[in-house]
Design a protein with these regions (language model features):
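Beta-strand/loop-rich accessory regions of lumenal/periplasmic or secreted enzymes
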Residues: 85-86, 183, 285, 680-687, ...
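Accessory beta-strand-rich segments of carbohydrate-active enzymes
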Residues: 1-13, 36-37, 51-55, 83-91, ...
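Beta-strand-rich binding/interaction modules
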Residues: 147, 228-263, 627-661, 687-696
Length: 1022
């Protein structure tokens, strides 16, 4: 019934117009075409409710459904744009690398699902604009088009615009549009991105009404020459030339220049040229996104566009924009919505960019395909550097069976053969690059073209890179997978401007930089943001800033990919991930790897990034001179042009001073420089004192309003005694005239004081019962705690932990003894901790002191068997009454914090409920801990329990046990226990980003051969 184009890599498009730049024409100038393109009288949007029928196989479609008069009464309806999986058809499937069908390019399964779409619309003929062009901005995977029963054409490449001249097919009045979308085609082998696989017409469909003679395409370039700049416009017309006028206006609306294009016969692609000279131009960059307006007038039509004057080049292994070396503080962003899937509309796109900007990112990589056209216009306007990536990924080819040699090097050796180095796919590879480049070529935000992602390297990419450099030599090129190639021949890398890598360790980057490289190093993906993480951002930041040849990178990734499935009883969303739709193959929750949840609530990792990448930092504070030295990490803007500074001094959690920091007369702090300004503050002689410096926007600044917090620094102030005085007071032995009696059995020691009864288990060296003032403190025996619910970043390490059986440990006290003193009772025990079936890995010398007033101090020394892997954690776990549901503490808060993930938190006194401590990751895991704490207090039901450390410790308070968090696959499956679970930790293993990255850095591993831990428990009546 249909031409068999969908398995022919040499028939990519039929009946489509040549690639061109994105624009929306109008009959008159319109400055609202970015946010409101529907205001153009030449733009007819065809979105809405379409008739739809799903077929499980293309062979089930026997009717000529596209014919006028076809009985479509059996059709359902579906919104366009949308993906059909989100409307009850087919099934969702998430895979990262593996093809969801047999790998036999260019062939796809015979039972190829498809969707038939029908839509009737009225076409109002306009004598001044009689031509009509039908645009599809995104369809997955390929599609056939009929209009009024006549075949119009075919196209593929899901995330790119396909345009058809339908003038001869249209009729006055009602028109009948039919579209057939196939789930798979030969192009599906090149659309193997790490995402849910979805299908349908997922971007806008519209008609453009055009005059008979008009501009077809234009290419804007800018060159800077000292105090002037040239704005050049190369253009071509449909059929024949037409009178044109090109005018440039500045942001205030003042005309800068106006010219008429002249013929340029030597330029076949754009045979008409024009250039406007701008004196004293205001340049575009990500921090100051200044835009001019360009108006292209022809009879009966006007095209309005934006121009950013900027240059980009590589020198000295650095990337320069307008002559200034830059660093990318970037993020990878998929177009993903939990309700609409691929169909991410304007408002969601704008919301994402607003959040990204507010959290101090300056760059975005469009992973791994071109985004909707208005995304780039918004990036121009808001200020982002963009790596624009072609819709090309054939990662599944790396999974081919390799003749019994399944080693990674052998997979790399063979990865390129099916597609990247296969001449049959050269046309398709170049086509995907061209469709990206030619559509987005006029966007100043785009400074790098990327050939695609994870597709190995070969002849096809050499051709794509050569074409890109020839077509647009003013921008840079990127392709990370150039390193994955066969050793059997030499390859051409001359058209790649940078060395790109994913998830490198600091050591591997240092090795590259030490070998006198000839290209800058960029991390196209790093710090995998899956679940609780990432935990290595500060280390990467410091490394990036200390090496000129390292130009920064792009976190993976912006949002969790989840499918919305309704709400829990408490109103929280339910989200599915890979495998939840009974699909196979799938890759589980590996799609839940973003800085925000599917509904765009921030993960704590997003807050961590924001403060790590704050635009300025304190270098030092000299108490004697009262001088505060700052470094400006911005690339273009002086600190005084964007930031207002305030300060706060706290002592033992109490704010004792705060105020505004004025800039001295003549003070400047240019980009990449340091300077000092005066700040005199009073510092008490005693107490743990911190100085916090806050950076606020001092005016509206590209999506960030005046007063918006850009970040903060925290400095521990030196004084005579920098210990927390409240902590010291808690460690003081309170006098008591009472005494303690001890009763001993073979199993227990029962200690009774004036207002407490404690039962000590001699077999474990731990307290089994604690009652104070007739209130129960322990619901069950306390435990030495080793396990934590593995985080997503523990996904590799947890295999070692499970092999060591850290989740099934037993505690054995070899001997115990006690001694009664005037102040209380001392209990000593020799304790071993061993996994079931394995040898012991911890020896503990334990000393408990129970004071007459009921306070209890633990002091222990631990020796670890170093043949075992690093510990998840070590500490005490207490099961307190559930009614003890309020927590107060001095430590790092208010959000969760860990040894390598605490830069969004700060030291202070915080108070909340236990439920507020829980970070509700979609896949349950360790969460809600607090690092560097002096004390924590839980209270409720008339009783309080305070834990105070001899040294700073970590704690976690939750209504979920670590066993529950470990066992359950989704947050909506969790059941709270009947206790408040308090974990008092000597330390936890760091967080890192090893879910898809290097092993946790050594300094964050809990692998001490020996350590000491001391903590005091103080019960009180509330």
């Amino acid at each position: 019934m249909i031409p068999h184009y969908y398995e022919d890599p040499h028939t990519l498009h039929v009946g489509t117009m040549p690639n061109r730049a994105y624009y929306i024409p109008s009959s008159r100038r319109s400055d609202a075409l970015v946010e409101h393109r529907e205001t153009s009288d030449r733009f007819q949007l065809l979105n809405g409710s379409w008739k739809f029928r799903y077929y499980a196989s293309i062979y089930d479609l026997q009717d000529a459904f596209y014919e006028v008069g076809y009985d479509a009464s059996a059709f359902d309806s579906i919104p366009v744009p949308s993906v059909w999986q989100n409307h009850g058809y087919d099934h969702h499937q998430y895979t990262n690398i593996r093809y969801p069908f047999p790998a036999d390019p260019p062939y796809v399964p015979k039972e190829n699902p498809c969707g038939a779409y029908l839509y009737d619309f009225t076409y109002p003929k306009d004598a001044t604009a009689p031509r009509a062009f039908l645009n599809f901005e995104g369809v997955a995977s390929c599609f056939y088009v009929w209009l009024n029963g006549q075949f119009v054409g075919y196209s593929q490449v899901a995330h790119s615009t396909s345009e058809f001249d339908v003038t001869k097919f249209l009729q006055d009045g009602t028109n009948h549009l039919a579209v057939l979308v196939l789930k798979w085609c030969d192009g599906s082998y090149m659309e193997d991105q790490d995402m849910f696989r979805m299908n349908g017409i997922f971007r806008d469909v519209y008609l453009l009404h055009r005059p008979e003679q008009c501009i077809e395409d234009y290419f804007i370039t800018t060159d800077i020459h000292g105090s002037t700049a040239g704005v050049a416009v190369r253009l071509r017309y449909y059929d024949s030339a037409v009178a044109a006028r090109i005018t440039l206006y500045d942001a205030a609306g003042t005309m800068v220049g106006s010219v008429t294009p002249v013929e340029a016969p030597d330029d076949a692609a754009f045979p008409y040229h024009a250039e406007i000279t701008v004196v004293d131009p205001t340049l575009w960059n990500a921090e100051q996104p200044y835009l001019y307006t360009l108006v292209l007038d022809t009879p009966n039509e006007t095209i309005t566009d934006r121009v950013g004057i900027r240059e980009v080049h590589v020198a000295n292994n650095q990337i320069y924009v307008n002559g200034q070396s830059i660093k990318f503080h970037g993020v990878n962003r998929h177009e993903s919505d939990p309700v609409t899937g691929y169909a991410v509309g304007f408002e969601q796109t704008k919301k994402d960019l607003l959040m990204i900007k507010k959290h101090n990112f300056n760059a975005i990589r469009t992973s791994h395909y071109p985004d909707v056209p208005y995304f780039y216009q918004l990036c121009d306007q808001y200020g982002f550097f963009v790596i624009d990536e072609a819709d090309n990924e054939s990662h599944g080819a790396s999974e081919y069976y390799c003749e019994g040699n399944e080693s990674w090097p052998n997979h790399v050796e063979n990865w390129n053969k099916p597609i990247a180095d296969n001449p049959e796919f050269t046309e398709a590879t170049v086509d995907r690059t061209r469709r990206c480049v030619e559509r987005d070529k006029n966007r100043p935000c785009v400074i790098i073209w990327s050939m695609g992602n994870e597709s190995a390297y070969g002849y096809t990419f050499e051709e794509a890179l050569a074409w890109t450099k020839s077509f647009d030599p003013r921008r840079l090129t990127h392709y990370e997978s150039a390193q994955y190639r066969s050793k059997n021949r030499k390859y051409d890398f001359s058209n790649i401007d940078m060395f790109s890598n994913m998830y490198p360790s600091l050591e591997s980057m240092q090795e590259y930089l030490d070998n006198e490289p000839d290209k800058p190093y960029i991390m196209c993906e790093y710090s995998h943001c899956m679940g609780n993480g990432p935990g290595d951002l500060e280390d990467y930041f410091q490394f990036i800033q200390s090496h000129d040849g390292l130009v920064g990178g792009f976190l993976w990734e912006w949002c969790d990919h989840g499918i919305y499935k309704g709400k829990m009883p408490d109103g929280r969303g339910i989200y599915y991930y890979g495998g939840d739709h009974n699909e196979w193959p799938h890759d589980g929750n590996f799609c839940m790897d973003g800085l925000v949840y599917p509904d765009r609530r921030p993960h704590t990792g997003l807050l961590e990034f924001k403060n790590v990448y704050r635009p300025a930092r304190v270098v030092k504070y000299d108490r004697e001179s009262g001088m505060l030295t700052l470094h400006n990490y911005m690339d273009f803007v002086d600190l005084t042009e964007y930031a207002a500074l305030t300060y706060q001094v706290s002592c033992d959690g109490e704010v004792i001073d705060n105020g505004f920091i004025p800039y001295p007369d003549g003070f400047t702090l240019p980009p990449h420089s340091e300077n000092a300004l005066p700040l005199a503050v009073h510092i008490p002689d005693k107490g743990k004192c911190f100085l916090k410096i806050f950076y606020h926007c001092d005016k509206d600044l590209s999506l960030r309003s005046e007063g918006h917090l850009l970040g903060f620094d925290e400095i521990l102030l030196e004084n005579e005694d920098s210990r927390n005085q409240k902590t010291l007071a808690m460690w003081s032995d309170a006098p008591s005239n009472s005494t303690i009696t001890v009763q001993e059995t073979d199993r227990h020691l029962t200690l009774r004081g004036k207002n407490f009864t404690y039962n000590f288990n001699k077999l474990t060296g731990l307290f089994a019962v604690m009652q104070y003032e007739d209130a129960v403190l322990l619901d069950k025996e306390m435990e030495f705690n080793i396990w934590r619910a593995p985080t997503d970043n523990d996904r590799k390490l947890k295999l070692d932990w499970l092999a060591a059986r850290y989740d099934h440990c037993m505690t054995n006290a070899y001997r115990t003894e006690y001694q009664v003193t005037d102040s209380g009772v001392t209990l000593r025990a020799k304790v071993g901790i061993a996994p079931i079936s394995l040898q012991k890995f911890l020896d503990l010398d334990v000393c408990w002191t129970v004071f007459n007033n009921g306070a209890v101090t633990l002091a222990l020394h631990a020796e670890r068997n170093t043949v075992f892997p690093e510990l998840p954690r070590f500490g005490l776990r207490l099961f307190l009454p559930k009614e003890m549901a309020r927590v107060s503490y001095f430590g790092m808060g208010p959000m969760e914090s860990y040894c390598d993930k605490h830069h969004a938190a700060s030291h202070g006194y915080f108070s909340s409920t236990i439920w507020q401590q829980h970070e509700d990751y979609i896949r349950p895991q360790e969460n809600g801990s607090h690092y560097d704490c002096d004390y924590v207090q839980l209270d409720g039901a008339g009783i309080k329990l305070t834990a105070v450390g001899a040294k700073p410790f970590c704690f976690n308070a939750s209504h979920y046990t670590q066993e529950e968090l470990t066992e359950k696959a989704h947050n909506y499956e969790l059941h709270p226990c009947d206790s408040t679970v308090l974990c008092l930790d000597y330390a936890q293993n760091g967080i890192g980003s090893a879910s898809c990255g290097p092993r946790l850095a050594e300094q964050y591993r809990l692998d001490d051969a020996s350590f000491d831990f001391s903590i005091r428990l103080i019960p009180e009546k509330a």
